[in-house]
């Protein structure tokens, strides 16, 4: 049973707002882990109302889990009830609520998804239907893929330069040592994938998802490989093209602007870093078939993928979240089991290695968030407004909290074509 304590009564809410608050608080009483304090500060009086929801099991992995949310707008409760977790993100973007530690709050919520699922069930069926239709309309057909990639990766290279490492890697790093810098951890990540591929100078590697060119350049310079790499992002293509020329690697690296479905030829090795999330559930079979077709017999394939917990996969597959609506339109996280089952069903690829780097991703996101905050004035100078800045803070904390709670993770998976 949860204990709730109340201070002074708030300004009178409307009947609808009171009812919505009551539903939310009932759901919060079903929390199983941690402690949440809800503070209402939207009233004109000097007094505040505070509700504290605490569970007998306040720890996670022997560490206390506690967070605070400050509600700044009386319409927050009904908005949340109507639109669920997506509306929570939208309300944050609009400044309707805040938290002194947003990541701690996201972690606490991720640890109590069963309680929050009950809240989602209370939402408007029409709103849910509209979310699903919007997500379906963004499915990653060849035409839509370009639009979806453009929506996130073509925001401007200067935005990403403000918070990424010097090599511009927008994917999880690998912290071999606790004191590794972000730059070193990103090199660790690239080198581990190269080791998994058993790269040698005679290899011709195909990379699906160039990013800003760091992995292709690393493989060419450090392992002497021939690399063919593709991206459908205009901004990334232009940036990678310039970097390849600056390094004098035009004879080693072939840079394409092709959808993965249009790639031809056969290669010794294949690498793809956090591109599979942009494939979509519907197109996962074709992605796997294409990857297999690009590999020579005996060829190795290494991917880095963000994954949803197996236990959440069915629920996630049938719903739409904040990231899919605002950050990565058309995005979809596979689970480890769904990936292995799909490769078994749609190819002859054999799984050779599985390596989890979920907590490394949490640390990577934390570093990105710190850098993003330090660069806030620079980001605003690019023309991004307060709502955009808050959206990105929410996105970074939302993801870090999920990785810390293990509801999402990231893996290196290595496959081989017989």
Regions flagged by a language model, labelled:
Residues 1-186, 192:
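Feature captures hydrophobic
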Residues 201-209:
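Conserved class I S-adenosyl-L-methionine
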Residues 212-223:
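Conserved SAM-binding loop of SAM-dependent methyltransferases across substrates and taxa
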Residues 240-241:
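Conserved SAM-binding loop
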Residues 261-270:
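A short acidic, Gly/Pro-enriched loop at the edge of an enzyme's catalytic core
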Residues 285-297:
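A short glycine-rich, Lys/Arg-flanked "PGG" loop and its adjoining helix->strand segment in the class I
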Residues 298-306:
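Conserved beta-strand signature within the Rossmann-like core of class I S-adenosyl-L-methionine
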Residues 307-418:
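Substrate-binding/catalytic lobe of Class I Rossmann-like enzymes that use SAM or dcSAM, i.e.
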């Amino acid at each position: 049973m949860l204990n709730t304590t109340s201070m002074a009564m708030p300004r009178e809410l409307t009947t609808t707002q009171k009812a919505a608050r009551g539903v939310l608080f009932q759901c919060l009483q079903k929390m199983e882990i941690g402690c949440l304090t809800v503070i209402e500060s939207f009233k004109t009086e000097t007094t505040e109302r505070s509700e504290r929801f605490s569970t007998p099991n306040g720890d996670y992995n022997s560490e206390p889990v506690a967070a605070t949310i400050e509600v700044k707008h009386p319409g927050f409760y009904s908005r949340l009830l109507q639109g669920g977790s997506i509306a929570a993100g939208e309300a944050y973007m609009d400044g309707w609520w805040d938290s002194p530690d947003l990541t701690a709050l996201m972690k606490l919520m991720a640890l109590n998804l069963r309680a929050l699922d009950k809240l989602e069930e209370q939402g408007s069926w029409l709103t849910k239907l509209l979310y699903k239709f919007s997500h379906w309309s963004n499915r990653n057909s060849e035409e839509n893929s370009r639009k979806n990639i453009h929506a996130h990766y073509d925001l401007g290279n200067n935005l990403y330069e403000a918070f990424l490492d010097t090599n511009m890697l927008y994917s999880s790093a690998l912290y071999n040592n606790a004191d590794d810098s972000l730059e070193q951890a990103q090199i660790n990540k690239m080198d581990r994938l190269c080791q998994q591929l058993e790269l040698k100078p005679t290899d011709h590697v195909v990379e699906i998802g160039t990013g800003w060119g760091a992995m292709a350049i690393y493989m060419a310079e450090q392992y002497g490989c021939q690399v063919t790499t593709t991206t459908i992002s205009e901004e990334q293509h232009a940036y990678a093209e310039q970097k390849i020329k600056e390094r004098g690697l035009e004879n080693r690296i072939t840079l394409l602007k092709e959808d993965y479905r249009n790639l031809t030829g056969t290669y010794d090795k294949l690498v793809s870093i956090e591109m599979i999330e942009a494939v979509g559930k519907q197109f996962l079979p074709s992605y796997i078939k294409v990857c297999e077709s690009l590999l020579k017999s005996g060829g190795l394939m290494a991917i880095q993928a963000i994954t949803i917990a197996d236990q959440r996969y069915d629920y996630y597959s049938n719903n739409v979240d904040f990231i899919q609506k605002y950050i990565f339109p058309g995005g979809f996280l596979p689970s480890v089991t769904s990936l292995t089952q799909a490769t078994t069903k749609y190819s002859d690829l054999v799984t050779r290695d599985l390596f989890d780097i979920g907590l490394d991703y949490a640390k990577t996101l934390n570093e990105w968030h710190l850098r993003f905050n330090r660069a806030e004035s620079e980001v605003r100078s690019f023309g991004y407004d307060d709502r955009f800045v808050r959206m990105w803070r929410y996105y970074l904390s939302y993801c870090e909290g999920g990785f810390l709670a293990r509801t999402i993770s990231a893996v290196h998976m290595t496959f081989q074509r017989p």
